[in-house]
Amino acid sequence: MNHAAGLSGMDEMMTIEDTYDWDKMTRALAEQAPWWEPGTASGYHALTQGYLIGEVVKRITGVSLGRFFNEEIASPLQADFYIGVPDSEFSRIGDLVPPPNSDIIGGDTAIDSIAAKTFKSPSISALDSRTDAWRRAEIPAANGHGNARSVAKIHTLLANDGYINGQQIISAETCRSIMQPRIQGMDLVFGNPMAFGLGFGLIPAEKNTRNLCFWGGWGGSRAIID
């Protein structure tokens, strides 16, 4: 969960249509040799992170990550957020407007570099998010759909030791564990120094005196939890 598995992309060329096929993506990842020794460095797993974690959830619980998230987190919190949007909600989704420069690679851009390969397979565009196929699919690292209120409500769990509205959704121990640094150093994809806990970015340990974690996504979304 700290982008250190060495599987930030795949040697096999995957298309945008492939990202909608859960079994194909997880099978390709299972067959993929890590691009670096796992646990030795982070490298932003832009799309693959969701499949790696989601498959673990599926094998343990028997349901997809989208369904698990809905049943265990979104529904109890009445949070208007989906991983895999029902057709009935499509009319409520605003089209994503790509930034003028969508190149987020800050590291080595040589064609055979880890950074370049990560965004080559699978290669996606912000405009892909406007399609019905994208919205229906479960691509947990990239296609969660919600509004600002739902994002704030869900992340409030971490700020309150997993407790909200009279419910203990996540254990306090798990919340504290998320804030613990797991890996820190030069990220092999971003090309910037990064620190990661469990699933979230962290302020570098020597400066993180307030237990802050954060993450963001397309469309300018960002959550900072204190």
Please tell me what each predicted stretch does.
Residues K207-F214:
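Short, hydrophobic/aromatic-rich segments at coil-to-beta transitions
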Residues N192-M194, G216-G219:
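A short catalytic or substrate-binding loop motif that flags glycine-/basic-rich loops and adjacent residues
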